[in-house]
Amino acid sequence: MSQLNVDLQEIAKFEALAAKWWDQHSEFRPLHQINPLRLNWIDERAGGLAGKKVLDVGCGGGILAESMARRGADVLGIDMGEAPLAVGRLHAQQENVQNIEYRQIPVEELAQEQAGQYDVVTCMEMMEHVPDPASIVKACQTLVKPGGHVFFSTINRNPKSYLFAIIGAEYVLRMLPKGTHDYHKFIRPSEMAHDIRNAGLTLKEMTGLHYNPITKRYWLAPNVDVNYMVHTVKTGA
């Protein structure tokens, strides 16, 4: 592909942190903390993950991908950063998780190879790091089987999300390294819904992901002002 739908600076951020991906006290602590919540949410809405072929787009070091494999899914994790993928492969080997594979490939390229081959496609905490989110949504639609499930998560774009996701998370609480997020790449739910419809997916549910920094507790609620997750289905034959 002559022009990849990637931001090299975004990839470099996570490449530099790759060795810490499975350290639950590192910059990736928030991903470890939210993972049980998002895993159960995906598992329930997909009608169970066991025995299904699952693709995790923008998998990084494999926190979600490996947890889905542990639920019995046959998982492929893809990412454009080689260092996080190497970490994911090593961790799966150390934990003897055999039903998982990792590849460095753009999702648009994989869509040309494996159209309609996946029961479930996940793309979590990744949409706000690419130049063209709509292209990602379309590729995910291509990859999932008719009747299959596609899940996304991202961050809303408004003053509240800037305050919470950037000022609060990166500068005040220091949950994330400074510069992790670019406010202008955040995606409003209306924009997300537009891309979903244009791709030929049916929006089933949109829910907010919330965090209390005092109790360090995460929960789901209807408010989608900051972080939110989306469940879609590919209808038709």
Curated annotation (Swiss-Prot):
InterPro entries referenced in this protein's UniProt entry, alphabetically: SAM-dependent_MTases_sf (IPR029063), UbiG_MeTrfase (IPR010233)
Keywords of this entry: Methyltransferase, S-adenosyl-L-methionine, Transferase, Ubiquinone biosynthesis
Reactions it catalyzes: a 3-demethylubiquinol + S-adenosyl-L-methionine = a ubiquinol + S-adenosyl-L-homocysteine + H(+); a 3-(all-trans-polyprenyl)benzene-1,2-diol + S-adenosyl-L-methionine = a 2-methoxy-6-(all-trans-polyprenyl)phenol + S-adenosyl-L-homocysteine + H(+)
GO molecular function: 2-polyprenyl-6-hydroxyphenol methylase activity; 3-demethylubiquinol 3-O-methyltransferase activity; polyprenyldihydroxybenzoate methyltransferase activity
Enzyme class: transferase
Annotated binding of S-adenosyl-L-methionine, by residue: R38, G58, D79, M124
Record SUPFAM superfamilies: S-adenosyl-L-methionine-dependent methyltransferases (SSF53335)
GO biological process: methylation
Pathway annotation from the record: Cofactor biosynthesis; ubiquinone biosynthesis
Pfam families associated with the record: Methyltransf_23
Enzyme Commission number, as recorded: 2.1.1.222, 2.1.1.64
HAMAP family: UbiG
PANTHER family with a match to the protein in the record: METHYLTRANSFERASE, UBIQUINONE BIOSYNTHESIS O-METHYLTRANSFERASE, MITOCHONDRIAL
Name of the protein this chain belongs to: Ubiquinone biosynthesis O-methyltransferase
Naturally occurring in which organism (per UniProt): Acinetobacter baumannii (strain AYE)
